[in-house]
Amino acid sequence: MAEKQTAKRNRREEILQSLAQMLESSDGSQRITTAKLAASVGVSEAALYRHFPSKTRMFDSLIEFIEDSLITRINLILKDEKETLNRLRLIVLLILGFGERNPGLTRILTGHALMFEQDRLQGRINQLFERIEAQLRQVLREKKMREGEGYATDEALLASQLLAFCEGMLSRFVRSEFRYSPTADFEARWPLLAAQLQ
């Protein structure tokens, strides 16, 4: 029985990896059908539906992976790092690095892969970005408590500026068909961003 469940889990992971790879390839710029996905995995469409009731559930699983990866790592940064600017730098770098390592999933983060899918999926991505922005805002607000001095500019404005930078770099990565790395020149860009945090 355990072998059967392991095989089913492995097949599910194989389907999700195949979908992510298709999103990374030129197929990712078009609607991905279950027929194309089944052919990529090497199974029938019926076999896909034995593991996932719909393509939407496949995207849900990928979004869940994105959420878990980013939020878990952000929480680790907040636990381990105490200095505000370094916390912010590491969170921004985490988002950009995740996008760079997972180009197919970056199409989901930018909404590009969700254009032909249910609106609910885009809503989940919107909620993820709202959670990240709220986390950035909290880090900015805690500066006064941690370091004795806050920011002259509203923390909500600063948080949205940082997130807009991340979203812009991820969009540029997708638009360029993954030629322009989101982390390229980050060490030169960060001082420009940090200078705005006053």
UniProtKB/Swiss-Prot annotation:
Q: Cross-referenced Pfam families, in alphabetical order?
A: SlmA-like_C (PF22276), TetR_N (PF00440)
Tell me which SUPFAM superfamilies the record gives. Homeodomain-like, Tetracyclin repressor-like, C-terminal domain
**GO MF annotation list:** DNA-binding transcription factor activity; transcription cis-regulatory region binding
Among the GO biological process terms of this entry, one is: negative regulation of division septum assembly
**UniProt keyword annotation of Protein biosynthesis present:** no
**Subcellular location, in the record's words?**
Cytoplasm, Nucleoid
Which InterPro entries does this entry report, sorted A to Z?
DNA-bd_HTH_TetR-type_CS, Homeodomain-like_sf, HTH-type_TetR-like_transc_reg, HTH_TetR, NO_SlmA, SlmA-like_C, Tet_transcr_reg_TetR-rel_C_sf
One term under GO cellular component? cytoplasm
Statement: the UniProt record of this protein carries the keyword Nuclease: no
For the HTH tetR-type domain, which residue ranges apply?
A: 9-70
Alphabetical keyword list: Cell cycle, Cell division, Coiled coil, Cytoplasm, DNA-binding
Among PROSITE patterns, the record links this protein to:
HTH_TETR_1, HTH_TETR_2
DNA-binding residues per UniProt? 33-52
Task: List the residue ranges forming a coiled coil, or say none.
Answer: 117-145
Superkingdom per UniProt: Bacteria
Q: Name the family.
A: Belongs to the nucleoid occlusion factor SlmA family.
Record's function text: Required for nucleoid occlusion (NO) phenomenon, which prevents Z-ring formation and cell division over the nucleoid. Acts as a DNA-associated cell division inhibitor that binds simultaneously chromosomal DNA and FtsZ, and disrupts the assembly of FtsZ polymers. SlmA-DNA-binding sequences (SBS) are dispersed on non-Ter regions of the chromosome, preventing FtsZ polymerization at these regions.
Q: Which PANTHER family match?
A: HTH-TYPE TRANSCRIPTIONAL REGULATOR RUTR (PTHR30055), NUCLEOID OCCLUSION FACTOR SLMA (PTHR30055:SF183)
Q: How does it assemble?
A: Homodimer. Interacts with FtsZ.
- For this entry, the protein name equals Nucleoid occlusion factor SlmA
Q: In which organism is this protein found?
A: Cronobacter sakazakii (strain ATCC BAA-894)
What lineage is this protein's organism placed in?
Bacteria, Pseudomonadati, Pseudomonadota, Gammaproteobacteria, Enterobacterales
Could you tell me the gene encoding this protein?
A: slmA
